[in-house]
């Protein structure tokens, strides 16, 4: 996929880049797979802000994605490749031979007219979903389950892929995009291939307005807030932090502070930390 550049007719256009969307084949989504998506503006059910800097943005509809890929031994033909405003990867509309329609995450190289399948007997080709025990070692995969039948949870972003490194006993060893090596139960499913829209990470937004359309609001520095809003706030004019080190809005150390639980149940499945050299 290519990235489009613009002539510098304005300061924003000078840096802005945008996907060419050349893989997209349909502008209209499948209505039966759409549901209303209410804007939460970063609030939880109590109305408290749980994600800062969210709000506004263009109204979207949620596309129901088949992360489970559990319709076995029934071939499906790819009807369209579509843009999904709720994720970075593209999605594909698959129409099964019995008439059912489902959206799946579109791997790179998947084209309209291709036939995909799920199940233990599916071929090893992009878009097919199989249990890890039926996938050869060394295969590149995405949309990986952590619990059997729960649906893919790992490696779902644009351009993402993991590699199946080994299979031993009840577990498969995976190398994730972060560099982490971890065990996953061998009966969990994964989809073959690398996800589409690999150049998403080099797209330059270019101007604040584009971010506002995406539902992101400005990030304000703590030092320009009042002391009741942030530990760095207050003082006359430009003031120092006033503490031994910078802290978060909730008073936790902002630099070098581990935020992951020190005793998490899943630690035993991680062979190599993503930060390890």
From Swiss-Prot:
Pfam families: Ribosomal_L2, Ribosomal_L2_C. GO terms for biological process: cytoplasmic translation. Residues 222-259 are annotated as: Disordered. GO terms for molecular function: rRNA binding; structural constituent of ribosome; transferase activity. InterPro entries: NA-bd_OB-fold (IPR012340), Rib_uL2_dom2 (IPR014722), Ribosomal_uL2 (IPR002171), Ribosomal_uL2_bac/org-type (IPR005880), Ribosomal_uL2_C (IPR022669), Ribosomal_uL2_CS (IPR022671), Ribosomal_uL2_dom3 (IPR014726), Ribosomal_uL2_RNA-bd_dom (IPR022666). HAMAP family: Ribosomal_uL2_B. Belongs to the universal ribosomal protein uL2 family. Part of the 50S ribosomal subunit. Forms a bridge to the 30S subunit in the 70S ribosome. This is Large ribosomal subunit protein uL2. It comes from Clostridium beijerinckii (strain ATCC 51743 / NCIMB 8052) (Clostridium acetobutylicum). The lineage of its organism: Bacteria, Bacillati, Bacillota, Clostridia, Eubacteriales.
């Amino acid at each position: 996929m290519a990235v489009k550049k613009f002539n510098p007719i304005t300061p924003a256009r000078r840096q802005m880049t945008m996907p060419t969307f050349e893989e997209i084949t349909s502008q209209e989504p499948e209505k039966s797979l759409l549901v209303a998506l209410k804007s939460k503006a970063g609030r939880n059910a109590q109305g408290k802000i749980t994600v800062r800097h969210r709000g506004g943005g263009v109204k979207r509809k949620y596309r129901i994605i088949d992360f489970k890929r559990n319709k076995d031994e029934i071939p499906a033909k790819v009807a369209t490749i579509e843009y999904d405003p709720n994720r970075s990867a593209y999605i594909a509309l698959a129409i099964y031979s019995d008439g059912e329609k489902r959206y799946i995450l579109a791997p790179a190289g998947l084209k309209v007219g291709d036939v995909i399948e799920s199940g233990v007997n599916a071929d090893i080709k992009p878009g097919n979903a199989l249990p890890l025990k039926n996938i050869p070692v060394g295969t590149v995969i995405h949309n990986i389950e952590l619990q059997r039948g729960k649906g893919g949870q790992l490696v779902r972003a644009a351009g993402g892929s993991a590699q199946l490194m080994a299979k031993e006993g009840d577990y498969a060893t995976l190398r994730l995009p972060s560099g982490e090596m971890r065990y996953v139960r061998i009966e969990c499913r994964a989809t073959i291939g690398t996800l589409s829209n690999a150049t998403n990470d080099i797209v330059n937004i270019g101007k604040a307005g584009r971010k506002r359309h995406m539902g992101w609001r400005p990030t304000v520095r703590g030092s320009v807030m009042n002391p009741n809003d942030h530990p760095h706030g207050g003082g006359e004019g430009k003031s120092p932090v006033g503490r031994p080190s910078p802290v978060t809005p909730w008073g936790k150390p902002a630099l070098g502070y581990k935020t992951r639980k020190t005793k998490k149940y899943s630690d035993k499945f991680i062979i190599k930390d993503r930060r390890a050299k």
